[in-house]
Regions:
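Catalytic active-site module of serine/aspartate enzymes centered on a nucleophile-bearing elbow/loop
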Residues: 299-300, 307-338
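Conserved acidic catalytic loop of the alpha/beta-hydrolase fold
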Residues: 98-100, 104, 111-131
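Short alpha-helix in the alpha/beta-hydrolase fold that links the catalytic acid
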Residues: 267-271, 280, 291-303
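Acidic catalytic loop of the alpha/beta-hydrolase fold
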Residues: 242, 259-263, 288-293
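Conserved hydrolase catalytic core segment
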Residues: 128-167
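Alpha/beta-hydrolase-fold enzymes
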Residues: 152-154, 158-242
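N-terminal cap/lid subdomain of alpha/beta-hydrolase-fold enzymes
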Residues: 28-95
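Short beta-strand/loop motif that positions the catalytic acidic residue
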Residues: 278, 284-286
Length: 338
């Protein structure tokens, strides 16, 4: 897929207050541009993923000749606001200072990102999105977008996601925030390397939520001769050291806050009332061992949208199942392709 940057001409107002005049959205598309009448598949990514599903997070499903065929469809994925992966956020340059915004960047909500996505859609001249797929945090965007722009989407897939942040998820975000703030270099923000040790700790907390005991700890059990368990700790140190090469602590704080803003029912009479207004053909896919969006949450959620269907994939990989169980996802997704 090809990388693009959309630069919005005008002031962008944020839901929680503040504005910027230099909004940018990084996005990837199929090599062939959009033309009227071409079938459109729009993917919404997870928390720290980027806008290149073919190259990074869903290569088994997206690409030339793959299920989501980039030569057949106009496939697009845009990066959320606040991210470290290209779209406007705290790591972006503040034109008034010539330095990153850091904490001067307005706080971002799910609704802000969805409004930005819709600006991009209009800029590209897309009147209908035949298939919208939201994975994890991307599902937050999909719920919000479907409610605010009913009639635009043909079919929607909500995968390993929720319509409102739960205390369980918000609690992990609170712990991650505490880890970031415990690093004294985080508040100094002399450069984007501030808060790196805190970011490693925050990411380790998040990793706990992405797998379940069977999928993570049983693969990292120490031998019976080991005095102090260390295998899983070594795994965490390796994963977090890789992560901080691509992410900064400030952007991570902002996307965690964005997750905490997720509530499609806010100001709309609650989640049930909001979802009842969705007009699209909706499918829910849940990972059986997902501890962030478990079956006991996703199945009742699916019942709130008239005519929706629910599928559960049996997996030992927890929330990360949506990245790993691509064959099972493909079997459910294939009949819905435009």
């Amino acid at each position: 897929m090809i990388k693009h940057i959309y630069k919005h001409n005008g002031t962008f107002e944020f839901e929680a207050g503040g504005s910027i005049d230099n909004l940018e959205i990084t996005y990837h598309t199929s090599p062939l541009g959009y033309t009227r009448g071409r079938k459109v598949i729009w993917l919404c990514h997870a928390l720290t993923a980027d806008s290149d599903p073919e190259g990074t997070w869903w290569p088994a499903l997206v690409g030339p000749g793959k299920l989501i065929d980039t030569e057949k469809y106009f496939v697009i994925c845009a990066n959320v606001l606040g991210s470290a992966c290209g779209s406007s956020g705290p790591a972006s340059m503040n034109p008034k200072t010539g330095k990153p915004y850091y904490f001067e960047f307005p706080r971002v909500t799910v609704r802000d990102t969805v409004r930005a996505f819709d600006l991009l859609r209009q800029h590209l001249g897309i009147e209908k999105i035949d298939l919208l797929i939201g994975t994890s945090m991307g599902g937050f965007m999909s719920f919000e977008w479907a409610v605010t722009r009913p009639g635009i989407f043909g079919k929607i897939f909500f995968i390993a996601t929720g319509a409102r942040v739960t205390p369980w998820l918000a609690g992990f975000n609170a712990a991650s925030r505490m880890a970031l703030l415990a690093d004294p270099t985080f508040k100094e923000h002399r450069d984007l390397n501030g808060g790196m040790e805190g970011l490693k700790a925050a990411r380790a907390i998040a990793l706990l939520t992405y797998r379940c005991e069977e999928g993570l700890f049983k693969q990292n059990e120490d031998s019976d001769d080991t005095v102090f368990a260390g295998k899983v700790g070594s795994y965490y140190r390796h994963q977090t050291s890789k992560f901080v090469k691509d992410w900064d602590a400030y952007s991570y704080l902002y996307v965690c806050d964005e997750v905490d803003s997720n509530n499609v029912g806010r100001g709309r009479g609650g989640v049930a009332k909001a979802l009842s207004e969705i007009e699209s053909d909706c499918t829910f896919i849940c990972m059986s061992s997902d501890e962030l969006f478990p079956p006991e949450d996703m199945k009742p959620l699916s019942a709130l949208i008239p005519g929706s269907s629910y599928h559960q994939i049996e997996t030992p990989y927890g929330h990360d199942g949506f990245l790993i169980e691509t064959s099972a996802i493909a079997d459910i997704l294939r009949p819905a392709l435009p």
